[in-house]
Design a protein with these regions (language model features):
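C-terminal motif of bacterial Sec signal peptides marking the signal peptidase cleavage site
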Residues: 23-26
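Extracellular/periplasmic metallocenter environments
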Residues: 29-50, 135-194
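Beta-strand cores of secreted/periplasmic/IMS beta-sandwich domains, seen most often
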Residues: 57-60, 86-113, 147-155, 159
Length: 194
């Protein structure tokens, strides 16, 4: 019994099929370059400091003056690496608050302390606490800008720290600020699961 001799057409079919199979398998195991570039670009723009690992780098307290100092870094639709209420700044009652705002993203951002009740506001311009907002709250500050918010808080309450640029807070750029009557010192970190 003899095997059939490959014809000219059949001679190229096997290498072609093997080449296509290699291409398909090889491509399916690699990351898409455009996705990898977007992910690395986002990682590069996201602040390296996350509160769950560096609380003391973001919040401090002077007990003598009852002053909480908080560093608020605006990243790509996040605060200090958190968004959508996933972090909470907890402060003692009647504290004096100093928020050092750092705009670290290429998209304009601002900050405002808004009510913690009801839906997340679409934009700023209606602070829940007097003087608790940055300059250019609706238009936002450019990358590299800094600002300082100084205000006092009441005995208790739940608020949101939002980006006041229209659509940013509803897009997830907000975290909680809670005035806890039992708190003796401030803290900042992931919001406890309820």
């Amino acid at each position: 019994m003899s095997l059939p001799v490959p014809t000219r057409t059949a001679a190229w079919a096997l290498p072609y099929a093997l080449g296509m199979a290699t291409l398909v398998v090889g491509c399916s195991k690699q990351e898409r370059p455009d996705v990898a570039v977007r992910q690395s670009s986002l990682a590069a723009r996201t602040p390296a400091v996350r509160a769950d690992t560096a609380d003391s780098q973001l919040v401090s307290f002077d007990a003598a003056s009852n002053t909480v100092t908080f560093k608020l870094v605006a990243g790509p639709f996040n605060w200090n690496g958190f968004g959508n209420g996933q972090a909470t700044l907890t402060v003692p009652p009647k504290s004096n608050i100093v928020v050092n705002f750092v705009q670290d993203d290429g998209t304009p951002h601002s900050a405002e302390v808004a009510s913690g009740e009801g839906p997340v506001p679409n934009s700023g311009g209606n602070p829940a606490i007097p003087r608790a907002y940055t300059n250019k709250v609706v238009e936002g500050l450019p990358q590299g800008a800094t600002d300082v918010m100084k205000f006092s808080v009441p005995d208790s309450g739940k608020f949101r720290i939002i980006c006041g640029v229209p659509g940013h807070a509803t897009g997830g750029m907000w975290i909680w600020m809670v005035i806890d009557p039992s708190a003796k010192t401030p803290s900042f970190g992931p919001t406890p699961k309820s």
